[in-house]
Amino acid sequence: MKKIITKRLVIRPFKDGDAPAMFKNWTGDDRVSNFCRWYTHKDVSVTEGFLDYCKSADYCWAITLKDIDEPIGCIDLVGMDANGVPEIGYALGYDYWGKGIMTETVKAIIADLFEKGYDKVEACHNIDNPASGRVMEKAGMTYCRDSEGIRKFGSDEKVKLKYYEIHK
C-alpha cells in the first residue's frame, strides 16, 4: 500500500512500533470505543494484537498528521457486500474530533477506492453517533438506508445503524 497525502495528513500503512500511540490516542479510550464494535483495549498488549491485524489486512490505514508520524486514528475496509461494494469504517482519537480530520481522511480513501476501480463506497454509523453521519455527508456521501448490527464483537446486543453511500 502506498501512502496517501492530503493537505494536513499522511494516511499510511501501519508499522511496527505504532501500538503505543494507537493505545494512547484511541484504542484505550472509552470515548472512542463507545461507538465502535470493538471493546476498549485494557493495555497496549491488546493493541499489539490489533496492530498485527492492521499490518496484515489488505486495506487498513493509520491516520497521521503530516508533522508527526504518530497514528491518531485508523480507517479500513470493514466489509464487502455481495455486489462487491466496499464498506469503510474508522476511528479517531478524541483529541482530534471536530477538526475535519476524519472528513479529510474519508474523502481521500473514497478517491483511492474509486481509483482502484470501485464504483460505489458505503459506510455506516450507530444512530447514537450522529457526528459520524455528518462526517459521511461532508465527504459527499448520502443517506441510503437503516439497518441493524451488533453493538460489540462477541455480543448479541443489537444497535440501529444508518448507512451512507457515494457513487463514482
Where are the model-predicted features located?
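Acyl-donor (CoA/ACP) binding surface of acyl/acetyltransferases
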Residues: 1-21, 25-30, 34, 60, ...
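Conserved GNAT-fold acetyl-CoA-binding loop/helix
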Residues: 31-51
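A short helix-loop-beta-strand connector motif used in the catalytic cores of GNAT acetyltransferases and
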Residues: 51-62
